[in-house]
């Protein structure tokens, strides 16, 4: 997508002298001796990374060097589906065929050895690659080796940064970079991150890129006010210090703002989709324009060069789906380069033009040996003009956002079971199981027009289709793995509609089994809820003991749900058996007071309005009056200030004060031994269940919104708002991609003086997992089950946007309003509300947020299945760990990497100074020896975050900052398998393993 209107340290260069031979394609797998006692091998190779710049073109140090970067920006779905874009179908919607782009580019590169091109989207490139002949693949490998075809970024997609979870970002980057490593070796390893189109940039994204080994980061979009200031102060390029916990330069990343977003300069677009005049150098032609073009280009280059600090400037030569006829581009660029450079001798012009790449441009900046300013916040929210804040997409298509988050959860369970069961997961009694389709579908969903909700409706439908089709082979894999690990061949069932209380097996069977798998590194006590048809059931735990259970009636539908608490070990499962008992009349609990409570929390509701009015933490003796209700903003369709309307990208209400969905709610109180609920009905299209389970330290709000009525001609943007008397001084806090927390201040930006044109939309920020407010004593935190937009628009208040339905397009290229066909879309979701003392709040919200993202997975079976192995007794409980992980450590990744290799990531999930009461912010030491029960680790190699290079061989360019020298790590030393995790540190390993014979 193109255009803001979507149309047309240590001293720099510490390793610059090392330009020796490239590392071979086997760099990730150097020969290691067998390990009698397990250890991790660290080798110091501080200059290996600089070798990758040896193919860069020569520059002229005494001139202004203009780096022309030919590129195409190929959205992995937007106006057309992924397949439609790749094959060039429906060009009446948008003329775009990626397969033809790559065909044409390769041909044009071969025609002139000085030409260069960068490619980004590996989802497309890998598909194209598989269709090529061996001869073509050999040619492409040589182009890559010579640096004429270079990959930037290297992820499966160019992911969104506002609505993505860090675990899914890491996964999609790993998928793309692994393809490049296995296909081209280190020759194809990208050196720069390239996010030219995402609509704002998160600090966590920069941190992840730095930990993946990138030398720099280029992007196109930033707030128009921010860009204006940066141009004046020569801060279009700086070092982004992207973590407050990781020691510099671990999360430091050199960052460059491209001068023209990612488009060619005006008048210099020579794609077949453009209308600019080609270069006519024949003086005899009446269309001769070469002299004027050269004059124009020299002025353009000189003016642009004044905005940057070195004798180098970059021009992006390409845009959306360009280069389908690459010759039109390259032929004119060849002429431009020749004509401009001829002026050096003819007229003494001090401008040198060359084909280049972002990495080669970065290399020259590094050699300039300058000191750079440091940025510590992020680039949200993004506005491309007054009244034009791109904060609507934080909440657009909430159903797809939830499906993506559920699929991430499901994929991690699938990956873990594949790792625990080994080859038995892939081939077993249920067929061929495979995690790859869901892994690829999830990677596609991270694209900046997918989970963001900014594609057309039929494309959003196709994204959902890809996820659904990816689940199926994972279900087969999980069935094989569970049979192998449990010793029972059951007819496993996966009820995908449990969120709307539909599961045929539990609603019809007299007896069934419930297998609960826990992907967390510690045991969980988790409430199982299943739709049933009777009122009395007997539930037995894995040891055959009867456990308490309840059947509650859902007032809105008069259906029943069975509840029981399941205790599930770390990275393992428990099997519970359920059987019907003779029916009894359900006992109703009556209470005049609208109060629900357990041993930790009490929630009171206003008897006159039915709204939540008070929350009390009984454990910490905290009482907070809090009112929660639903409101809606009337979506702007344009006014006398601006024609800008609310749309898929843009949030713009036509007034600052939202309207009540209802001032009161009809209520129904449900009290049972295992749950207490207040059912609130606000309107025909908005309801909520406020719920408390025993031993639960948070209040659960399960909301249902939609279909949003628009018969009155008004688009509506629905929020859930919490109002308190907390003195919050204009401050609130949001997560960055589900990881570190950033402080937000109303009507304020840390690096420039804000002219606020939209008091509501201009204060919205992305919320991936949590938002909170605090007065320094008490903290009110709300956890989300998907990405949403959120804010605190007045002191003591906190709001989250849960749904939007709009009647007008926002003129950013989609060309259709965010208005699902038919009656509209109804959406269900959850907010978890925590009230804590500030010093203990992090311990609560960190661990609860982890459980939300990696929730237990329920698998059902009829029971009575045959034994998997006749000689082995079945087991009804299993843990993949011999000992639990400490609470501050998260098992981020456990997945198959090769026939006898696993990918393992361990993460410290607390920030520095975040928790002092339980020392959860302290470093944690783990012994990986015999940690896992299903396999033995025989060899361990530590890698960078995306697992595409050994950490021992990874080296990044070094930069000097205005904050002073940054000490770089000393050469690594061999250490034992006992590893230490610092706060917010993620360590990644490739583990050679041997599976236990009996699983």
UniProtKB/Swiss-Prot annotation:
General function of this protein: Necessary for the catabolism of N-linked carbohydrates released during glycoprotein turnover.
Catalytic activity: Hydrolysis of terminal, non-reducing alpha-D-mannose residues in alpha-D-mannosides
One GO CC term on file: lysosome
Signal peptide residue numbers: 1-50
Cofactor note: Binds 1 zinc ion per subunit.
Cleaved propeptide residues: 591-621
InterPro entries: Gal_mutarotase_sf_dom, GH38_C, Glyco_hydro/deAcase_b/a-brl, Glyco_hydro_38_C, Glyco_hydro_38_cen, Glyco_hydro_38_cen_sf, Glyco_hydro_38_N, Glyco_hydro_38_N_sf
Pfam families: Alpha-mann_mid, Glyco_hydro38C2, Glyco_hydro_38C, Glyco_hydro_38N, Laman-like_dom
Residues holding Zn(2+): 73, 75, 197, 448
Posttranslational modification: Processed into 5 peptides of 35/38 kDa (A), 11/13 kDa (B) and 22 kDa (C), 38 kDa (D) and 13/15 kDa (E). The A, B and C peptides are disulfide-linked into a 67 kDa complex.
Residues glycosylated per entry: 134, 369, 499, 634, 640, 681, 755, 919
Subunit and interaction comment: Homodimer.
UniProt entry keywords in alphabetical sequence: Disease variant, Disulfide bond, Glycoprotein, Glycosidase, Hydrolase, Lysosome, Metal-binding, Signal, Zinc, Zymogen
Single annotated GO MF: alpha-mannosidase activity
Disease involvement: Defects in MAN2B1 are the cause of lysosomal alpha-mannosidosis (AM). AM is a lysosomal storage disease characterized by accumulation of unbranched oligosaccharide chains. The disease manifests itself by head tremor, aggressive tendency, ataxia, failure to thrive, and early death.
Chief subcellular location: other
Cofactor(s) needed by this chain: Zn(2+)
Protein name: Lysosomal alpha-mannosidase
Matching SMART domains: Alpha-mann_mid
Gene Ontology biological process: mannose metabolic process
Region (Disordered): 1-25
UniProt enzyme class: hydrolase
Cystine connections: 269-274, 495-503
Active-site residues, Swiss-Prot/TrEMBL: 197 (nucleophile)
Family under the similarity heading: Belongs to the glycosyl hydrolase 38 family.
Subcellular location: Lysosome
């Amino acid at each position: 997508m193109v255009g803001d209107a979507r149309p047309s340290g240590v001293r720099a260069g510490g390793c610059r002298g090392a330009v020796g031979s490239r590392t071979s394609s086997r760099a990730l797998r150097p020969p290691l001796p067998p390990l009698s006692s397990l250890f991790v091998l660290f080798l110091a190779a501080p200059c290996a990374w600089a070798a990758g710049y040896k193919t860069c073109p020569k520059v002229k140090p005494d001139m202004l060097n203009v780096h022309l970067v030919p590129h195409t920006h190929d959205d992995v779905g937007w106006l057309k589906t992924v397949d439609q874009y790749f094959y060039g179908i429906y060009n009446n919607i948008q003329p775009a065929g990626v397969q033809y782009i790559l065909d044409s580019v390769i041909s044009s590169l071969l025609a002139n050895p000085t030409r260069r091109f960068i490619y980004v989207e590996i989802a497309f490139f890998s598909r194209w690659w598989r269709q090529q002949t061996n001869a073509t693949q050999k040619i492409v490998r040589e182009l890559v080796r010579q640096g004429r075809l270079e990959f930037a970024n290297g992820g499966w997609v160019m992911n969104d940064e506002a609505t993505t979870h860090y675990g899914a970002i890491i996964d999609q980057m790993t998928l793309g970079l692994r393809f490049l490593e296995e296909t081209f070796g280190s020759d194809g390893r990208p050196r720069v991150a390239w996010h030219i189109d995402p609509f704002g940039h998160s600090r966590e994204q920069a941190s992840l890129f730095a930990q993946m080994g990138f030398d720099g980061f280029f992007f196109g979009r930033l707030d128009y006010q921010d860009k204006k200031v940066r141009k004046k102060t020569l801060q279009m390029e700086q070092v982004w210090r992207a973590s407050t916990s990781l020691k510099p330069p671990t999360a430091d990343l050199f960052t460059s703002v491209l001068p023209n977003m990612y488009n060619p300069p005006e008048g210099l677009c020579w794609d077949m989709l453009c209308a600019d005049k080609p270069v006519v150098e024949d003086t005899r032609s009446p269309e001769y324009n070469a002299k004027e073009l050269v004059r124009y280009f020299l002025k353009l280059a000189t003016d642009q060069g004044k905005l940057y600090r070195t004798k180098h400037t970059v021009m992006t030569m390409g845009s959306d789906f360009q280069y389908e006829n690459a010759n039109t581009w390259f032929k004119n660029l060849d002429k431009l380069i020749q004509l401009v450079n001829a002026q050096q001798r003819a007229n003494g012009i001090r401008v040198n033009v060359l084909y280049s790449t972002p990495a080669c441009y970065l290399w020259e900046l590094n050699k300039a040996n300058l000191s750079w300013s440091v940025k510590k916040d992020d680039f949200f929210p993004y506005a491309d003009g007054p009244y034009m804040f791109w904060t609507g997409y934080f909440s657009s298509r909430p159903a797809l956002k939830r499906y993506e988050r559920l699929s991430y959860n499901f994929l991690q369970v699938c990956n873990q079971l594949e790792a625990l069961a080994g080859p038995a997961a892939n081939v077993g009694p249920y067929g061929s199981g495979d995690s790859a389709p869901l892994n690829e579908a999830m990677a596609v969903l991270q694209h900046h027009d997918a989970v963001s909700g900014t594609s057309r409706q039929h494309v959003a439908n196709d994204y959902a289709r890809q996820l659904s089709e990816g689940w199926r082979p994972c279900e087969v894999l999980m069935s094989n793995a569970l049979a192998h690990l449990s010793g029972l061949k059951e007819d496993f069932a996966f009820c995908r509609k449990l969120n709307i209380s539909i599961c045929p097996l539990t609603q019809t069977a007299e007896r069934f089994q419930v297998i609960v798998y826990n992907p967390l590194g510690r045991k969980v006590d988790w409430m199982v809820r299943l739709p049933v048809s009777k009122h009395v059931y007997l539930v037995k735990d894995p040891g055959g003991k009867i456990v308490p259970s309840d059947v509650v009636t859902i007032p809105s539908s008069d259906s029943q749900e069975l509840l029981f608490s399941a205790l599930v070990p770390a990275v393992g499962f428990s099997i519970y058996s359920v059987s019907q008992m003779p029916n009894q009349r359900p006992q109703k609990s009556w209470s005049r007071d609208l109060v629900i409570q357990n041993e930790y929390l009490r929630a009171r509701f206003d008897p006159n309005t039915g709204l939540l009015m008070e929350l009390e933490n009984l454990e910490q003796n905290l009482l907070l009056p809090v009112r929660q209700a639903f409101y809606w903003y009337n979506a702007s369709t344009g006014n006398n200030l601006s024609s800008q309307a609310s749309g898929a990208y843009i949030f713009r209400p036509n007034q600052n004060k939202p309207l009540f969905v209802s001032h009161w709610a009809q209520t129904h109180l449900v009290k049972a031994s295992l749950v207490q609920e207040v059912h609130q009905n606000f309107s025909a299209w908005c309801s909520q269940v406020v719920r408390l389970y025993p031993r639960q330290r948070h209040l659960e709000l399960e909301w249902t919104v939609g279909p949003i009525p628009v018969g009155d001609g008004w688009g509506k943007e629905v929020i859930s708002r919490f109002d308190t008397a907390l003195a919050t001084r204009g401050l609130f806090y949001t997560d960055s991609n589900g990881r570190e927390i950033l402080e937000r201040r109303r009507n304020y930006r840390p690096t420039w003086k804000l002219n606020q044109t939209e008091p509501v939309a201009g204060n919205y920020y992305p919320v991936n997992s949590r938002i909170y407010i605090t007065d320094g004593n008490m903290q009110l935190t709300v956890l989300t089950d998907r990405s949403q937009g959120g804010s605190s628009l007045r002191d003591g208040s906190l709001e989250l946007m849960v749904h939007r339905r709009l009647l007008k397009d926002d003129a950013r290229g989609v060309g259709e309003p965010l208005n699902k066909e038919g009656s509209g879309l109804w959406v269900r979701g959850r907010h978890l509300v925590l009230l804590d003392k500030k010093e203990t709040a992090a311990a609560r919200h960190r661990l609860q947020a982890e459980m939300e993202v990696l929730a237990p997975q329920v698998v059902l079976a009829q029971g009575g299945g045959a034994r998997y192995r006749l000689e082995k007794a079945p087991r009804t409980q299993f843990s993949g760990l011999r000992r639990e992980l400490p609470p501050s450590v998260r098992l981020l990744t456990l997945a198959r990497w090769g026939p006898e290799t696993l990918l393992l990531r361990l993460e410290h999930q607390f920030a520095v100074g975040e928790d002092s009461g339980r020392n959860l912010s302290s470093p944690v030491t783990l012994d990986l020896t015999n940690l896992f029960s299903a396999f033995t680790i025989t060899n361990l190699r530590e890698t960078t975050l995306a697992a595409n290079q050994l950490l021992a061989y990874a080296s990044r360019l070094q930069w000097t900052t205005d904050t002073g020298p940054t000490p770089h790590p000393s050469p690594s030393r061999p250490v034992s398998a006992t590893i230490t995790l610092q706060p917010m540190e993620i360590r990644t390993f490739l583990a050679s393993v041997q599976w236990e014979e009996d699983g």
